[in-house]
Amino acid sequence: MVVVGAWSLAARQASGLELRPGVVVFAQDPAQRQLAEWAVARFERAGLSPPRVEIHFHADTSGCRGHLGYAQIGRVGVCTALVNEMARRNLLHEMGHIWIDQNVSRAERVRFLELRGLRTWNASTIDWGYRGYEQGAEIISWALGNRILTAQIPDNGAARLAAGFELLTGIELPIPG
């Protein structure tokens, strides 16, 4: 019976655990699964549908192309063994990318660039903090998170971040907590 239970747990981890329809987490550590559940709940608490996404956790940065997080086409990776405020921020940031991909129109992206005084949405020739795509994900992460960590982008005062969040999402900034 124990062997069957261990096999069942291993099979579930290999196939992922569906947290919500369209949201699947791949993690061996229960704390990482709880982190994914927390992040999904943050979207819902704010009145946003969470993105349809696969969430993968990795022990080191090799699963995220050398970074702490990575997002691409409905899949995010969080590359840390720790579950802490930085991991929460990183997961919300990467999920923010996918949410933007699935919910923000081209016209809204143009308005966001204008609001933030940016020239490009995601050109790799521009520094990370001056890309609209990165600023959008960072703003979503800040707005949905605990707001303990400062958004890692220029022009990061609360009023400016709130304006960006409202433009991207169409809703008011949620109360932190």
Question: Predicted regions span which residues?
Answer:
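Active-site scaffold of zinc-dependent metalloenzymes
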Residues: H56-R88, D101-Q102
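C-terminal region of N-terminal signal peptides and the immediate post-cleavage residues
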Residues: V3-P21
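Structural recognition of the beta-strand scaffold that forms the well-ordered cores
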Residues: G77, I98-I100, E138-A143
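Catalytic Zn2+-binding segment of zinc metalloproteases
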Residues: M95-R111
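Surface-exposed patches in mature extracellular/periplasmic domains of secreted proteins
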Residues: A46-H58, A107-L113, I148-N156
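Soluble non-cytosolic domains of exported or imported proteins
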Residues: F26-E37, A81-N90, D127-Q135
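Auxiliary, metal-adjacent structural segments of Zn-dependent hydrolase domains
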Residues: G16-Q72
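Metalloprotease/metallohydrolase-associated module, dominated by Zn2+-dependent proteases
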Residues: R111-G177
